[in-house]
Amino acid sequence: MRGSVERGWGWGHCASSPLLLWTLLLFAAPFGLLGEKTRQLSLEVIPNWLGPLQNLLHIRAVGTNSTLHYVWSSLGPLAVVMVATNTPHSTLSVNWSRLLSPEPDGGLMVLPKDSIQFSSALVFTRLLEFDSTNVSNTAAKPPGRPYPPYSLADFSWNNITDSLPATLSATFQGHPMNDPTRTFANGSLAFRVQAFSRSSRPAQPPRLLHTADTCQLEVALVGASPRGNHSLFGLEVATLGQGPDCPSMQEQHSIDDEYAPAVFQLDQLLWGSLPAGFAQWRPVAYSQKPGGRESALPCQASPLHPALAYSLPQSPIVRAFFGSQNNFCAFNLTFGASTGPGYWDQHYLSWNAPGCGLPSSGRLVPTSPGHHGSALGAPGLMLLGGGLVLLLHHRKYSEYQSIN
């Protein structure tokens, strides 16, 4: 089934509930495969001919000489396998009997194997919650007393086929299967996956630039009852290590702040030295929809650290593609601080991350003085104007001919 009809992203009965929102960009294309202005895209839920429908979403982005494969699934914790090949003819092969078995190795392949130039995975393993009531240091780690985490392997997920009519997007929406305290009685955790056929910026903050090589993830926690009066939420994220080492985490600073209330910063997870792939996000989440400056929350990422595979909720698709002998690394993302706006305001939290692939180089985009004034304040606006005057005077003087 393929998505082809434009439709807004709704939250059902939770639309007016409090929310937390975060967005991530994913990219999986080595340098030699980049530069496609457009790609032919398809979204397909791979059918399970052996039993009930499973949430296995294949995004295939075909360029002139390459193909990007993003395979998302809620079998176990929500995960994505990212593969880039150097041919427009590579295909995904799924062996359902093996994938659903206790030993899923080899149940997921991209063929031909020798066309693969890059592959990695992200696994969203746990939803974290902290009590920040008595925490005055906003940079404290952890940001409060931790509550028992919610394992995303123990979530019940919707049938994503119902969300596919939205153009080039699908939504995984779930809640704990065992919820004795009814924390999620009126709430849900949702992951919205979006693919792009060309470069553009989304309409809502943080408005990160995406290209035909990227895939965007938006995470929203809506309507769930916090276990404390000042609960902070977070996500535990795991990825494959590179041999004995972990991928690198970097901060990229830029003056391009027209599109985000964050402080001129991008955080990015980089695979490979070129790099061959990345996950990129603004260090900001939102406690209201639509997001804006007044509802912006800081987003903090912990350093990556090696993690034992058995200590993490296992993803069948990751093991099916990469096998069982892998090194994992993990990090935590936390949203909000003990002071200021928070999830407790409206029970809403959202985070957005654009990108898999080679990160864009913080390009400067045209901005208006009004945008610079609001982002930098009056002194910043004066500095910008003064620099412009000096530049014009310099050009004017340079037009005079020297007199001997």
Curated annotation (Swiss-Prot):
<feature type="glycosylation site" description="N-linked (GlcNAc...) asparagine">
    <location>
        <position position="134"/>
    </location>
</feature>
<dbReference type="GO" id="GO:0005765">
    <property type="term" value="C:lysosomal membrane"/>
</dbReference>
<keyword id="KW-0325">Glycoprotein</keyword>
<comment type="similarity">
    <text>Belongs to the GLMP family.</text>
</comment>
<feature type="signal peptide">
    <location>
        <begin position="1"/>
        <end position="35"/>
    </location>
</feature>
<feature type="transmembrane region" description="Helical">
    <location>
        <begin position="372"/>
        <end position="392"/>
    </location>
</feature>
<keyword id="KW-0812">Transmembrane</keyword>
<feature type="topological domain" description="Lumenal">
    <location>
        <begin position="36"/>
        <end position="371"/>
    </location>
</feature>
<feature type="glycosylation site" description="N-linked (GlcNAc...) asparagine">
    <location>
        <position position="159"/>
    </location>
</feature>
<keyword id="KW-0472">Membrane</keyword>
<keyword id="KW-0732">Signal</keyword>
<feature type="glycosylation site" description="N-linked (GlcNAc...) asparagine">
    <location>
        <position position="186"/>
    </location>
</feature>
<feature type="glycosylation site" description="N-linked (GlcNAc...) asparagine">
    <location>
        <position position="65"/>
    </location>
</feature>
<dbReference type="InterPro" id="IPR029382">
    <property type="entry name" value="NCU-G1"/>
</dbReference>
<dbReference type="GO" id="GO:0061462">
    <property type="term" value="P:protein localization to lysosome"/>
</dbReference>
<feature type="short sequence motif" description="Lysosomal targeting motif">
    <location>
        <begin position="400"/>
        <end position="404"/>
    </location>
</feature>
<feature type="glycosylation site" description="N-linked (GlcNAc...) asparagine">
    <location>
        <position position="229"/>
    </location>
</feature>
<comment type="function">
    <text>Required to protect lysosomal transporter MFSD1 from lysosomal proteolysis and for MFSD1 lysosomal localization.</text>
</comment>
<keyword id="KW-0458">Lysosome</keyword>
<comment type="subunit">
    <text>Interacts (via lumenal domain) with lysosomal protein MFSD1; the interaction starts while both proteins are still in the endoplasmic reticulum and is required for stabilization of MFSD1 in lysosomes but has no direct effect on its targeting to lysosomes or transporter activity.</text>
</comment>
<feature type="topological domain" description="Cytoplasmic">
    <location>
        <begin position="393"/>
        <end position="404"/>
    </location>
</feature>
<protein>
    <recommendedName>
        <fullName>Glycosylated lysosomal membrane protein</fullName>
    </recommendedName>
</protein>
<dbReference type="Pfam" id="PF15065">
    <property type="entry name" value="NCU-G1"/>
</dbReference>
<dbReference type="GO" id="GO:0016020">
    <property type="term" value="C:membrane"/>
</dbReference>
<dbReference type="GO" id="GO:0005764">
    <property type="term" value="C:lysosome"/>
</dbReference>
<dbReference type="GO" id="GO:0050821">
    <property type="term" value="P:protein stabilization"/>
</dbReference>
<keyword id="KW-1133">Transmembrane helix</keyword>
